Regions:
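Membrane-embedded transmembrane helical bundles of large multi-pass transporters/channels
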Residues: 1-55, 163, 167-171, 177, ...
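Structured non-transmembrane domains adjacent to transmembrane bundles in polytopic membrane proteins
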Residues: 63-81, 92-250, 254-427, 651-852, ...
């Protein structure tokens, strides 16, 4: 509409004069319309958090290499990309029972929490132990009973053979007369021999008959030798004093009570020791012969050859000796044995769980490999990790972090421990940033409002006057956040900085617009105009400068909407909408408030309050500038040279983690994790290899293709900045012998494929290589290593035919940051040109001058360079931090928009005075004097509003708040009062120079504007 007024040959003043008529006649309706707009925005306002994003890398362009790699990993690989939650457990030694109890209890607590259904997997070192104990118990149980069966067979061969003969002999003797001669005993022996062997032969496996027949014959021969043919015996002597089992025991094993054994004693060990050539079999037969006994009364009972307890004890002891397991595991192996043969999965699982709960890292009978162990427990054993994987299609993990932390506290209490525990990882960072952003708002906004009320109240000498800007901009913020929700829902995700930056920008700029309008109203009232005329004249003359100022802000942030970097795009759109709403409110609702409340807004003061001391200062400043303009110009230039040198020579930091305060749990956990595991362990860089061939099947691997992938893994490992590599041929960080796959048994082949599986895609044609960087993933050194990896990929493709025909993509958090930086760097140049050209065009149309817009842009760039240099020096030398990489473009955009306000207010007032007939010098002096107080007040309001961002705990907001504070104070108190008048005094008529066509149009507009304003406002 303002442009329409220019097209029709009259200036913007005419448009605002007519707008003022609408406001005067419909002020109450305007109130109602804005209240309705606020009410309509409330439902969207309440949901705005749902469209806020807290990760910078989430704004990575979708067509970037890292974004494409990320999508491939999500689709093809069942592995974390650094987006998992992490529970970090710290202590002097996390291998003890305290960490064990907590980790096990935490697993159970998280799994049983219905609010955490989006957790797909929970993994810690005790999960590894649990799986290993389950497998160990199952395998050992099978081995134990296989060993027991063999032991029972050997015992039966050695002692069962003699036992059968002794029993047969006892039966025969018991059926004979009470007395027996030696000849009769010999007959008993022959009869027992005849009946025993068929029984023995029927029970001995055929493969052992050739071994046992000579052994039996030796036993029978020795049995006969144990009797004296000339002696007389009775049944008592044969069956009780020298019982058959005792006689057989002496023959097989010997009599321990005799110092010298008869030659026919202890035949078992002698026979099997000399008859078996296989050393393993010989060892078993001799061990059984040594351990067991035939006779079970009473001293030999625990070692009775056919006793279950004896078999159990021997089997367990043999297993311990065979496997080299220490005696401390005797009870554990015994419990596995006691499951019985072929136990159910449930019983094995229950035992494994109990062993896990009751044992420790020190005592478990099975240990994971060092590579697997080191993924969960640090080298110094002071830090342990629990990894929480989230479902890809589940609720946002960020919303589960507080519940997880609550469960961590519950698990800590239930386990009876008091460990130092942190929940960190990408979702925790995002949650903590969200919480910190809310805390920042709760901390910053009240201070901002207080400062604005204080400054406006002091400026107007009123308690009521501050309520209009605060209420008006507060309403506009509510409406603007409703629009932000729509942007986040239908256009682009919204960066979390919008929550702080947009309200502050609106409070700063919007309040300036309100103050400028109210101040002009007070000036008109002081000149003797009534309320209606004052509202009309203030809007007519101040409206143009307000719109011009607001248009530069809207344009500056609007250019960011064209950025390829989503973070800048979302901030630009949000603040552009916010300032637009604030501008509309200032031009409609504030004049309506002036119409409704009038002079009562200045209670308890009055409209015409004098401020002689301020007038004197600005008059003196104008006089000083008139006398020393060259000195002012030279001073400004002398400051600009070193400031510019500092800006271009100092670097910036891309470290996302540095933005997160150390006081937050996620940052503290991250710091502990980095100390224990190294900076790149949890957020590795990965290379996706999309091959044209299949890499594996259920029982087959493509060794030729894997050789090329292994070459890529080894090449990556040799690169500076890479500390470890994982991949199909390095599944645990060390190479495996994949080339011998065909020589392995089915079980070993399955195990090898299973170990490779996390790094092989579901399509069977893709592979992933992880590179653990030795520097923090968000640091500049990590980005440098990332660029080297990408360069190495091209080299690999030139050296390997398979890789040359494959697609290789490098992704991960570092890659996302690098791609984001590349996109933002291109945006920086494009946006700088676009915003400066756009602002120049707006000022050219508004001021009808070519030089003055260029001069406005130059002076704001000077103040921006001074502020940037100051912030760099303060950040590096006092705060100990580098400048955040996104700060320069954000500061430029914000200050090209907001920083021009005061210059525009001054220049439009000078132009107004020139239009009314004053000379350039007189107009400059008068404008500086009349606008000094109001522009200073506006500058203090904006500086105060943005300075509250230094109360934030987020580094970027601290630096941005400090930079804007410096720029605004420089612009309002120095540039506008001293430098601008100095330049304009020297340029004289060039201040208003423009091409003839623009100059002629400007004269026509000014002439028509003056005539029509006289008609509209009256010639006062």
């Amino acid at each position: 509409m303002v442009l329409l007024s220019l097209v029709h040959g009259y200036g913007p003043e005419m448009f605002f004069a007519r707008l003022s008529q609408t406001v005067i006649h419909h002020s109450r309706a305007i109130f109602m319309l804005w209240l309705v707009a606020l009410g309509a925005s409330i439902p969207a306002l309440l949901q705005v958090q749902n469209v806020i994003v807290y990760s910078d890398t989430s704004f990575n362009p979708k067509n970037s290499e890292s974004s494409i790699a990320h999508d491939l990993v999500s689709r093809e690989f069942q592995i974390s990309q650094g987006e998992s939650g992490l529970v970090v457990i710290t202590g002097e030694d996390v291998r003890g029972v305290d960490a064990r109890n907590f980790a096990i209890t935490l697993n159970r607590t998280l799994q049983e929490d219905p609010a955490l259904s989006n957790i797909s997997n929970i993994t810690n070192i005790y999960d590894i132990y649990s799986k290993q104990l389950l497998g160990y118990a199952s395998v050992v149980n099978s081995q134990l009973y296989e060993s027991e069966n063999t032991t029972a067979l050997v015992a039966s061969l050695e002692y069962g053979t003699a036992n059968i003969y002794a029993n047969q002999w006892s039966r025969i003797v018991s059926q004979g007369p009470f007395y027996a001669s030696g000849a009769q005993v010999a007959a008993y022996n022959q009869e027992a021999n005849a009946s025993s062997w068929p029984l023995i032969a029927s029970q001995v496996p055929s493969t052992y008959l050739s071994l046992i027949k000579p052994y039996y014959n030796l036993f029978y021969q020795s049995w006969n030798q144990s009797f004296n043919p000339s002696s007389q015996y009775n049944v008592y002597q044969l069956m009780v004093q020298g019982s058959p089992l005792l006689r057989a025991q002496n023959i097989t094993k010997g009599n321990p009570g005799l110092q010298s054994q008869p030659s026919y004693y202890n035949i078992t060990s002698r026979y099997f020791g000399s008859s078996i050539s296989d050393q393993q079999s010989k060892g078993l037969f001799l061990s059984v012969a040594k351990y067991f006994n035939l006779y079970c009364f009473p001293c030999s009972y625990p070692d009775y050859w056919n006793d279950a307890a004896g078999l159990r004890a021997f089997t367990i002891s043999s297993f311990l000796n065979l496997t080299g397991t220490g005696p401390s595991q005797y009870n554990t192996i015994g419990e596995i044995y006691d499951l019985g043969p072929s136990p159910s999965f449930a019983s094995v699982s229950e035992l494994a769980s109990r062993l896990l709960r009751e044992g420790s890292v020190y005592s478990y009978p099975v240990q994971p490999g060092r590579d697997a162990y080191s993924q969960f427990v640090s080298a110094d054993n002071n830090t342990m990790l629990v990894i929480l994987d989230f479902k890809n299609n589940g609720p946002d993990p960020r919303n589960s972090i507080q519940r997880i932390r609550d469960d961590v506290a519950v698990a800590n209490r239930l386990s009876g421990q008091n460990l130092t525990i942190f929940v960190t990882g990408a979702p925790a960072f995002n949650y903590d940033l969200e919480t910190e952003s809310v805390n920042d708002i709760e901390r910053i906004d009240p201070v901002t409002v207080f400062l604005i009320i204080l400054i406006i109240g002091l400026f107007f000498g009123s308690l009521a006057a501050p309520l209009v800007p605060i209420s008006a901009i507060g309403l506009s913020i509510g409406v603007a956040f409703g629009l932000v929700y729509l942007v986040g829902s239908f256009v682009t995700s919204v960066h979390f900085l919008v929550l702080t930056l947009m309200p502050i920008a609106m409070l700063g700029a919007g309040t300036d617009y309100c103050i400028f309008l109210i101040s002009r109203y007070a000036e008109e009232r002081k000149s003797g105009h009534d309320k209606k005329e004052s509202v009309q004249r203030s809007l007519a003359w101040a409206g143009g400068s307000i719109v011009t100022s607001g248009a530069t802000v809207v344009l500056a942030f609007g250019t960011l909407a064209f950025a390829s970097f989503g973070m800048l795009r979302s901030i630009g759109l949000a603040v552009m909408l916010g300032i637009s709403v604030a501008l509309l409110v200032a031009l409609t609702l504030v004049p309506s408030a002036l119409m409704v409340f009038g002079d009562r807004l200045f209670w308890p003061g009055h409209v015409g309050a004098k401020r002689e001391e301020k007038k004197g200062y600005y008059a003196k400043a104008a006089g000083f500038t008139a006398r020393h303009s060259k000195i002012v110009l030279l001073t400004a230039l002398s400051l600009s040279v070193p400031a510019t040198a500092i800006v271009f020579s100092s670097g910036t930091s891309h470290d996302f983690i540095a933005q997160i305060p150390d006081s937050l749990e996620s940052r503290a956990g991250y710091n502990n994790m980095v100390e224990g595991f190294g900076p790149g362990a949890v957020t590795p860089t990965y290379t996706i290899i999309l091959t044209p061939v299949r890499l594996d099947e259920s029982n087959w691997i493509n060794a030729t293709a894997l050789s090329a992938i292994s070459y890529a893994e080894n090449s990556t490992l040799l690169m500076p900045g890479v500390s470890k590599v994982y991949g199909p041929t390095h599944p645990l960080g060390n190479p495996i012998s994949y080339s011998t796959f065909n020589q392995l048994g089915p079980t070993e082949q399955s195990e090898m494929i299973r170990s490779m599986q996390p790094f092989l895609g579901q399509d069977g044609r893709s592979a992933m290589v992880w590179a653990v960087l030795s520097s923090e993933p968000y640091s500049d050194s990590a980005i440098s290593t990332l660029n080297s990896i990408r360069a190495n990929v091209k080299t690999l493709q030139s050296q390997s035919p398979l890789l040359a025909s494959s697609t290789l993509l490098v992704g991960g958090e570092t890659a996302s940051l690098a791609d984001l930086t590349t996109a933002a760097s291109a945006d920086y140049s494009n946006m700088t040109i676009l915003v400066l050209v756009g602002v120049f065009i707006v000022l050219l149309l508004a001021l009808g001058s070519v030089f003055t817009p260029l001069r406005l842009i130059l002076t704001i760039l000077l103040s921006v360079s001074w502020a940037m240099a100051a912030v760099m020096l303060i950040s590096q030398n006092i705060l100990g931090a580098q400048l955040t990489w996104i700060l320069p473009i954000m500061l430029l955009v914000i200050m090209v928009g907001l920083g021009l306000d005061y210059d525009i207010f001054l220049v439009t007032r000078i132009r107004e005075l020139v239009l009314k007939g004053l000379t350039d010098d007189a107009a400059i002096d008068t404008a500086v004097e009349r606008t000094g107080a109001i522009i200073t007040a506006c500058g203090l309001v904006t500086a105060g509003a943005f300075s509250t961002m230094m109360l934030s705990h987020i580094l970027l907001l601290q630096q941005l708040g400090l930079a804007i504070l410096i720029v605004v104070l420089l612009d309002a108190l120095v540039i506008r009062i001293y430098l601008v008048p100095s330049i304009m005094r020297h340029m004289k008529r060039f201040n208003w120079w423009a091409p003839r066509i623009i100059k002629q149009a400007r004269k026509t507009i000014d002439r028509n504007s003056g005539a029509r304003l006289s008609e509209e406002l009256g010639n006062r």
